[in-house]
Amino acid sequence: MNSTSLYAAIDLGSNSFHMLVVREAAGSIQTLTRIKRKVRLAAGLNNDNHLSAEAMERGWQCLRLFAERLQDIPQPQIRVVATATLRLAVNAGEFIAKAQTILGCPVQVISGEEEARLIYQGVAHTTGGADQRLVVDIGGASTELVTGTGAQTTSLFSLSMGCVTWLERYFSDRNLAQENFDDAEKAARDVLRPVADELRFHGWKVCVGASGTVQALQEIMMAQGMDERITLAKLQQLKQRAIQCGRLEELEIEGLTLERALVFPSGLAILIAIFTELNIQSMTLAGGALREGLVYGMLHLAVDQDIRSRTLRNIQRRFIVDTDQANRVAKLADNFLKQVENAWHIEPISRELLLSACQLHEIGLSVDFKQAPYHAAYLVRHLDLPGYTPAQKKLLATLLLNQTNPVDLSSLHQQNAVPPRVAEQLCRLLRLAILFAGRRRDDLVPEITLQALNENLTLTLPGDWLAHHPLGKELIDQESQWQSYVHWPLDVR
């Protein structure tokens, strides 16, 4: 592999040190290595902001691992940044001097505002959804809050609170009592109050979280079969569960890993304060943050206005998808959707996910015609899809699995991006669009009227179409039968 196409970003955080190594490929990035080590640097800061020798040694030990991988990468294509703890530490110079010797490249201590800007860039390059967003990143010793539209930030704040510092300050007795949470939340709201008005003034349509705390919440919700949107009600529910556990060392929540458990209650308290103070309705997980911001900055790639479209184009190229056919199926599915939208009330994001499934429905053919839907589902489940959340990927895979043949209803109910009934409706429309676009020519797609009454679909074809298309009639009869097996009434006229 040509080393000139390799780039590395290292983030010396207050809780963890991270390294990301990527390869530039066709205007996007392909992840080659991700290494994360819990160093808990912030825990080594005393009241005088002096970093302990033990904490520094933990950091240097981690950097020796990273250094081995950096030897293969040209120095101009490496960026190493240090954040909150090394901004605060009075003896940061000692740590950084040795860190630079170990890594063989410069280490830059960045300001809180620069950290916030880079986090926003990482989100803008990797996260789909509405353009106007609020980005929240709860680190070990600082929390970044950024508003922006597209690639442009409108306000940037870096606040002195984080999951490690709040752990040491409000959960040092290791008790998970209501009082501990109350104190931690009140303190976080006090820190937030001076910046809340400006954030609200700029406003946002979507809120995304880009930190270990939000990642942990996502993992918990996926494990417990909830949908992926984080809401205040869910956060309060998890807080009550933590309080029931009583002690930090006894904290057990389905989906919460041991590695994340230590700083979970403190991160949760900060997030509850942010939701309450800013009146956030819901939050989803970002596709990338600081490290991705560093990498895309080195590559000088423009922020794509529609990340999901870029992702679909890249995958279609990679798996040699017939884009004319993908567009034909998408156009037909969209036509069907418009005809039933008054009855089914499908939301815009669900429509977008249906059309994404149409664009990718034939990628399984690149493996083999036999079991192509299984291959398509497998590929989508395991590919990196910038712009799509983990739950959305799971829904896409489930739709592709059920694009033809008998329906696996349980898989449609196990995804948690949309309610089960909506997943069933999207699946029905996808199957019909694929069936009627099967001749692969625009002039051979019949004029179809589709009506929905609750779950009953009535499909009306031109007068003598069925009589002149015996194979088409056979395929439609078979589809009616498959849909009836799972109690989806389909009446063809």
UniProtKB/Swiss-Prot annotation:
The enzyme's main class, written as a single word, is hydrolase
Alphabetic keyword roster: Hydrolase
Keyword flag Glycoprotein: no
Q: Name one GO molecular function term.
A: guanosine-5'-triphosphate,3'-diphosphate diphosphatase activity
- What does it catalyze? guanosine 3'-diphosphate 5'-triphosphate + H2O = guanosine 3',5'-bis(diphosphate) + phosphate + H(+)
Any GO BP: nucleobase-containing small molecule interconversion
Instruction: Classify the source by domain of life.
Output: Bacteria
Quote the EC number: 3.6.1.40
**CDD domains on file:** ASKHA_NBD_EcGppA-like
Q: Describe which pathway this protein belongs to, using the record's wording.
A: Purine metabolism; ppGpp biosynthesis; ppGpp from GTP: step 2/2
Reply yes or no: does the keyword Hydrolase apply. Answer: yes
Family in the record: Belongs to the GppA/Ppx family. GppA subfamily.
What function does this protein fulfil?
Catalyzes the conversion of pppGpp to ppGpp. Guanosine pentaphosphate (pppGpp) is a cytoplasmic signaling molecule which together with ppGpp controls the 'stringent response', an adaptive process that allows bacteria to respond to amino acid starvation, resulting in the coordinated regulation of numerous cellular activities.
- What this protein is called in its record is Guanosine-5'-triphosphate,3'-diphosphate pyrophosphatase
Q: What is the lineage of its organism?
A: Bacteria, Pseudomonadati, Pseudomonadota, Gammaproteobacteria, Enterobacterales
Please state the gene responsible for encoding this protein: gppA
